[in-house]
Amino acid sequence: MSTHIGAKQNEIASTVLLPGDPLRAKFIAENFLEDVICYNDVRGMYGYTGTYKGKRVSVQGTGMGIPSISIYANELIESYGVKNLIRVGTCGSINKDIKVRDIILAMGACTNSGTNRMRFNGMDFAPIASFDLLKKAYDIGKSKGLDIKVGNILSSDLFYNDDKDAIKLWSKYGVLGIEMEASGLYTLGAKYGVNTLAILTVSDSIVTGEETTAKERETTFTKMMEIALELAE
């Protein structure tokens, strides 16, 4: 056991999907995995292990924001030896060409968070995805006939941000969407030498105002889930 994860040793697979919403973790386990065990319910942050097409895979809720995902990622790596950590989450589009329900593979993750500035003594670090996972996910998506978007995203500490000019600036520099976790995950991947990737479904468009419901975000974004599960080794 670790501080926030109640699993015993060997109960967690080497590949773990990381949805922010613990109910999405439950949905993935119940609808995609076989021979499922629930290894964690500490703080209501469910974790499950099962098999997908014969391959062992786990799914662990993380909560929202860089501090929260960093807690779970740290413990999964340090206490349980996880090698592949794949965020499956949502983001808001800030690009007019990125539509609701599009899938984005986050090649890099900018941030306005102070966590990396603290970690690197005021200097900037460029958190990026693992190329192998990124390439495999892209190829899987294309083989399924999906229009996969690949590019930079922003991991923001602010969910409600009134500074529209800042959003326009990020968009001007090619950032595709905004979420709240990937930068922290990618930084820890670099620190520990493990593979990390964020696969994101666009849940709303900051450009057009179109959005999806909470239930849709929990249960209908299955294409990104399937791509992530196919990455299990």
From Swiss-Prot:
Claim: Hydrolase is one of the keywords in the record: no
UniProt-listed InterPro entries: DeoD-type, Nucleoside_phosphorylase_CS, Nucleoside_phosphorylase_d, Nucleoside_phosphorylase_sf
Site (Important for catalytic activity): R217
The reaction(s) this protein catalyses: a purine D-ribonucleoside + phosphate = a purine nucleobase + alpha-D-ribose 1-phosphate; a purine 2'-deoxy-D-ribonucleoside + phosphate = a purine nucleobase + 2-deoxy-alpha-D-ribose 1-phosphate
Binding site for a purine D-ribonucleoside: H4, E179, M180, E181, S203, D204
GO MF entries: purine-nucleoside phosphorylase activity
Enzyme Commission number, as recorded: 2.4.2.1
Annotated catalytic residues: D204 (proton donor)
Family matches, as Pfam families: PNP_UDP_1
The keyword Magnesium is assigned to this record: no
Protein known as: Purine nucleoside phosphorylase DeoD-type
